[in-house]
Amino acid sequence: MKLQFLRRVKMKSLLKKSFACLLLLLLGAFLGIYLQRNDSIKIYINSLLEEGILSYARSTDFHDVENSKVNLLEVRSIELSRDSDTYDTEIDSKYILRKREFNQARAAIILIDIWDTSKEPNDGFKERHESFVLNKIVPLINLARKHKIQVIHSPHSSPISKHVLIEPQDIVLEVDNLPFQMQSLYLHNLLKERGISTLLYAGNSTHKCLFDRPDGIYGMRKLMDDFILVRDATMAFEYHTTLEGELVKNVFTNYIEESYGTSTTINDLNMSLSSPESP
């Protein structure tokens, strides 16, 4: 009798646990379906998550970097013409060139989607990209390594070009399986650990991955505020109406120069790094 009683008690306990688990599963399924259909709730939860990430990111300081060399680097921004006193048009907008302090120990170059295009079906893009990697990206990487600037590789969807050699000191981001906000935070934490506060961007495509990926300029905009686009080390998959003159790349370069940061060139970066330290 006692054994049967204990078995009944155990069975009831097991049934209660099973029922509780079933309720939790049903509740989870209901919430999942509800969130998929309710955009306002999704937006609210996403904003809470983003605020939490920003709060955490701002709570820690960048590590100090000792004995770092500071030079002057020429950068470019764009100023839109909005003169209320005289007649002006959009063509009156102008580039602004200035020299800024550049601390190479606090800088990193992030290379977005430097693809292996050996299987690229568009022959013209494949040829342009091969030339771009050999004549722009490889020299930029060599320049960075010569001056001990951190090189970060961020490939998405395709392997890295066979022309780009990965060295032990390089960082290769492989976090595509994380939620977007976590990818941004992951990069941000890597940079903080190394005392890096300036990101130089290069790679593909100026108006897509380089800009709007979680580790792109737009994705990192709330976590950092010092972005420099290496404008002759970026390219875009152009449209048939824009290929001549690389209009997509150039227009989006202007957009970045207006709203998100500045740009420079490989040559300007080389001159800055090769010059004596600024007083």
Where are the language model's segments positioned?
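Short beta-strand segments at enzyme active-site cores
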Residues: 111-112, 149-156
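Active-site-adjacent betaalpha module
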Residues: 32-108, 127, 138-139, 146-147, ...
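N-terminal signal-anchor transmembrane helix specifying type II single-pass membrane topology
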Residues: 20, 26-33
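Aromatic- and glycine-enriched glycan-recognition loops and surfaces
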Residues: 130-136
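Acidic/histidine-rich, surface-exposed loop or edge segments in extracytoplasmic proteins
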Residues: 107-125
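N-terminal Sec-pathway targeting helices
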Residues: 7-24
